[in-house]
Amino acid sequence: MAAKDLLNKGLLLHGIGAGVLKSVTNKIAEMTTSQSMKMDITATTEDVYGGDGLFPLYTYISKKEGNVEITNAEFKLSQVQIAQGTKITTGGKRNYRVLLTKASKNLIDGASLTGVETIAVIDPDGNDASKNVTVTETGGVTFGEGAAEGEYAVWFKATDANSVRAEMLKNAMPEVATFNWMFTTEDSEGNKYQIDIYARRVRADGELKIETERDKATAPSLKIKILDPGDGHDDFAVVTVTPLAA
């Protein structure tokens, strides 16, 4: 199909497709279960007036902005490392909550725990019981003489070799990345096309929201800003349309 035919080809924009962000240090966020992707290019114009005329003699663009917002159906740690300046480590600590009585000798019977850190010990009346309950680094429990009868709730952390930890650093900026998106669509006659969207340099806006709610699945979003392409390039964003074989 000739270029002039594609330029004037009307396409139905539906479906979501998939995308990937790759930072300058090779951090990757792949998005294959998104709910929506929106790219918004805006411009600020300035008018120049002269003489007695009421219409501007000239108008020019003083500023351009490009933004992409992606709403995902699933939460991924890779999204956190793109949205924030992060340090990723493995073998982090996992939170636990267990219920114990004065007869308990271990936080979890039969479990091998290491690196235990007590968060809170709550007595049967809902008060702090940390003075009456001792917890060891390997999960052993000892109740003092002053401990009352009843059920105790113990919150603690323990090392888990399978955990992955994303530390959000207070003075770190989100990394510059490239943005690629692709989806398949069709024209009114049913012919298939692929649309690719590319931005050479982008950076997340630093916003991160994690929300949980009973009986509801929430959709985390990622907002990124398109930057000047730099390095002598003029194309800050590119849209490519390709006809697909039947």
Regions found by a protein language model. Give the residues of each.
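Short N-terminal helix-initiation segments at or just after the protein's N-terminus
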Residues: 2-18, 159-172, 246
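Solvent-exposed edge beta-strands and adjacent loop segments
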Residues: 2-82, 132, 195, 199-221
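Beta-strand elements of well-folded, non-transmembrane domains
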Residues: 41, 72-76, 158-160, 183-189, ...
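Short secondary-structure capping micro-motifs at structural edges
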Residues: 54-58, 139, 162-169
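Beta-strand secondary-structure signal
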Residues: 67-71, 153-155, 178-180, 221-225
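Extended beta-strand solenoid/passenger and fiber regions
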Residues: 76-134, 158-193
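Mixed-charge, glycine-accented linear interaction segment located at domain edges/termini
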Residues: 121-125, 135-137, 143-147, 194-246
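Small/polar beta-strand repeat architecture
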Residues: 145-164
